């Protein structure tokens, strides 16, 4: 059974406990490019005065979790997530992209900044309903380039957890978000909304071309 909790506590749904970057490889891409993109996100976070922890998604990518202060609103967290994603993209635009429409990604690693608001994300240690039953598992930053998602399954996780659960120790303390960083993110279009409008525009253009 998979477990996908929300990012906020019950009764405080407008105040998320984390902001999250979901990093996925291009179709058929190796995990090594995900690692490189995750390190871009870490660099962008450091530049913004923030810190995060990373875990495999249990699929092909990773999730970077950034604990945020209790007073943070969903809108503020979403804005900062967009800002960090765009900053990471700018560090290596040949590797990473924030393009929500798959055909626009050009074989690059996708930095998904839409895990905000009422979104859910698979929990650390949750198994996934996939061949081999992989598990979403925390990895120290310094070891990320030495693992693959296939290293963490329902068969290997119990042994890896024998010395204790590492996720809580890897997560930094909750952090306040800079007002300047929030404003930076507010100026960036929401990816899902932008993609929806662009999809409609392209559909209209195709209909026009077909009719001409």
Locate each region found by the language model.
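C-terminal accessory nucleic-acid interaction domains of nucleic acid-metabolism proteins
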Residues: 1-19, 25-26, 47, 75-212
């Amino acid at each position: 059974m998979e477990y996908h909790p929300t990012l906020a506590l019950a009764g405080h749904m407008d105040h998320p406990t984390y902001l999250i970057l979901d990093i996925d490889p291009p179709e058929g891409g190796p995990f090594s490019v995900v690692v490189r993109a995750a390190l871009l996100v870490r660099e962008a976070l450091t530049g913004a005065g923030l810190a995060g922890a990373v875990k495999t998604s249990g699929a092909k990518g990773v999730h970077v979790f950034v604990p945020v202060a209790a007073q943070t609103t969903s809108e503020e967290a979403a804005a900062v997530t967009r800002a960090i994603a765009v900053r990471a993209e700018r560090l290596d635009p040949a590797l990473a992209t924030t393009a929500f429409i798959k055909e626009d990604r050009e074989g690059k690693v996708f930095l998904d900044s839409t895990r905000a608001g009422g979104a859910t994300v698979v929990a650390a240690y949750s198994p996934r309903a996939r061949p081999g039953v992989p598990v979403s598992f925390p990895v120290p930053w310094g070891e990320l380039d030495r693992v693959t998602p296939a290293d963490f399954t329902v068969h290997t996780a119990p042994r890896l957890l024998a010395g204790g659960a590492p996720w809580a120790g890897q997560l930094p303390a909750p952090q306040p978000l800079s007002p300047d960083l929030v404003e930076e993110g507010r100026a960036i279009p929401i990816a899902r909304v932008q993609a929806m409008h662009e999809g409609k525009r392209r559909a209209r253009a195709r209909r026009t071309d077909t009719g001409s």
